[in-house]
């Protein structure tokens, strides 16, 4: 097949990130300069985002570019490529500041792993083939394994890396076995071919009446298990709290946002190829997981004193919310549902960048004495009375994560409630409301600690370093994020209109 100019433009994000990886590798040979490589990483991701928009403008009113039935680059994929690049930029900024204060040897390779994970995320959002899907997930998983173990002086990090490798390997095995079972019956790994073959069967009962067709059900079930691990929904969540707590903040943020966005995007594509006769099967599986994720995540976060563990369980809860939207998407594939999922993911992304950014800022003032992040909630006692602006930004990000009105997070959660009610998912919608109410307990616990006047001077925090947060790149980033959260919380129509241009 000849690759034409339009297709070359469509592939530019991957090409740009690939060139950036090669450039940094060659640069490391001659000299190690963390600042230079961090800047190169950010520039590469910005160019990749711009190139995605160029493709969208070039192929206006077109369905997208297909390559050998392997990938499909359309407006939908452009949005999620931009989101993944934004996560990568934010992680690069947080990672740079963290590496400045942590004595980690060979810090330049941190950005290589981050870029490789970003390529994996891009492959997931543009995939139109099960092999590309598996390749994208593995690129993310392998890169994350390296990023988790980056603090090589910490035995805990090495232990967590081994745990993640084992559990990730198990989930990938389930995913690969599911792909094999589907291929055994359909004879194809292309989404388009699989959709056509599965559509030839009238219903699931007819399918199950043929012994060989049970391979499809087994394959789909195993693939959902593999995806469930990557999405960190119950009961595939056991790894998440330890990993979030023990890894660098930049890596935890990438896990909470980048990988979740990429997996959600590929699930949207994959679920849309399955015929309607699979609705009942998928509805049961996703509903049970959604209910358990929402309740378990909210309840388990309440007794935690570790902010990172709270955010881990919050991530589980939000995975449950996303499953409700995916169920609605299966029941009624329309633009408003895809728009709702996208709005929620964007609001979730900004809230997480704000929260994790503040944790990273405080950690740089804490790890001067202790080689750990500022994870314990008591380290934030009375922070408002020393750094009021930093605390206000922290409160804005947390309130957005909780879905409080006048924040962008409320708009995202409102969209999910709307599609839940519109598709008559009454029980799941009620569970979502209950879970949101429960989650307020641990979100408010963080906020009240900030305003506790009994602990104004925390001896574990170097306030001379902390007061310089505004002149750091991560300080500028969280200020911008807080402004965006408030602006889109008051005037969401701008971002909603923008996202409408990207729906499938």
From Swiss-Prot:
Q: Does the keyword Translocase apply?
A: yes
Query: Per UniProt, what is the membrane topology?
Result: Multi-pass membrane protein
Q: What is its EC number?
A: 7.1.1.-
Q: Where are the transmembrane segments?
A: 9-29, 38-58, 78-98, 114-134, 135-155, 164-184, 216-236, 254-274, 282-302, 309-329, 341-361, 392-412, 425-447, 476-496
What's a single GO CC term here? Answer: plasma membrane
Q: Which reaction does it catalyse?
A: a quinone + NADH + 5 H(+)(in) = a quinol + NAD(+) + 4 H(+)(out)
Per UniProt, subunit arrangement is: NDH-1 is composed of 13 different subunits. Subunits NuoA, H, J, K, L, M, N constitute the membrane sector of the complex.
Described function:
NDH-1 shuttles electrons from NADH, via FMN and iron-sulfur (Fe-S) centers, to quinones in the respiratory chain. The immediate electron acceptor for the enzyme in this species is believed to be ubiquinone. Couples the redox reaction to proton translocation (for every two electrons transferred, four hydrogen ions are translocated across the cytoplasmic membrane), and thus conserves the redox energy in a proton gradient.
Family stated for the protein in its record? Belongs to the complex I subunit 2 family.
Descriptive protein name: NADH-quinone oxidoreductase subunit N
The species this protein was found in: Blochmanniella floridana
Per the record, the gene is nuoN
